[in-house]
């Protein structure tokens, strides 16, 4: 099964459980590292930060449904965690949520002679984001290789 289809299938199973427990399903990833497969579930919540207890609670409930439905053929490790301080920004809703914050955006190839830009996220609309760094740059989302918040403590 293709990875994107597998993640869609897992999201359909996992998202209702995560939301029932009053968390947001921030992001899912399924990766192979050092010969082992990992299903990583990143959770968030509006108020306060994610604790180890939050991750354990979600992990137990999600593990139950994944064991029953068994959407992943390979054996894998389940990891549940917070997106972290320098969280990745993957969806338009992530970019919109963090307008006004400092971000680092890396490009597929180059854009206006640059491979990346660090600056303040100004806008996120219609498959474009605008970042003000060395200069203000309007970036098509298909040119984004990766984007992260730059940490503030």
Curated annotation (Swiss-Prot):
This is Ribosome maturation factor RimP. HAMAP family: RimP. Keywords: Cytoplasm, Ribosome biogenesis. GO terms for cellular component: cytosol. It is found in: Cytoplasm. GO terms for biological process: ribosomal small subunit assembly; translation. InterPro entries: Ribosome_maturation_RimP, RimP_C, RimP_C_sf, RimP_N, RimP_N_sf. The gene is rimP. Required for maturation of 30S ribosomal subunits. The keyword Cytoplasm applies. The lineage of its organism: Bacteria, Bacillati, Bacillota, Clostridia, Eubacteriales. Belongs to the RimP family. Signal peptide: none annotated.
């Amino acid at each position: 099964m293709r990875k994107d289809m597998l993640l869609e299938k897992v999201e359909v199973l996992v998202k209702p459980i995560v939301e029932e427990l009053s968390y947001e399903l921030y992001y899912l990833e399924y990766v192979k590292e050092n010969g082992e497969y990992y299903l990583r579930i990143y959770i968030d919540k509006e108020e306060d930060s994610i604790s180890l207890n939050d991750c354990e609670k979600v992990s137990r409930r999600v593990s139950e449904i994944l064991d029953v439905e068994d959407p992943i053929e390979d054996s894998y490790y389940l990891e549940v965690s917070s997106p972290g301080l320098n969280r990745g920004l993957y969806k338009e809703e992530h970019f919109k949520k963090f307008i006004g914050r400092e971000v680092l955006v890396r490009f597929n190839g180059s854009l206006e002679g640059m491979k990346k830009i660090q600056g303040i996220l100004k806008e996120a609309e219609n498959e474009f984001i605008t970042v003000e760094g060395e200069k203000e740059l309007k970036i098509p989302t298909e040119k984004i290789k990766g984007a992260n918040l730059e940490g503030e403590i």
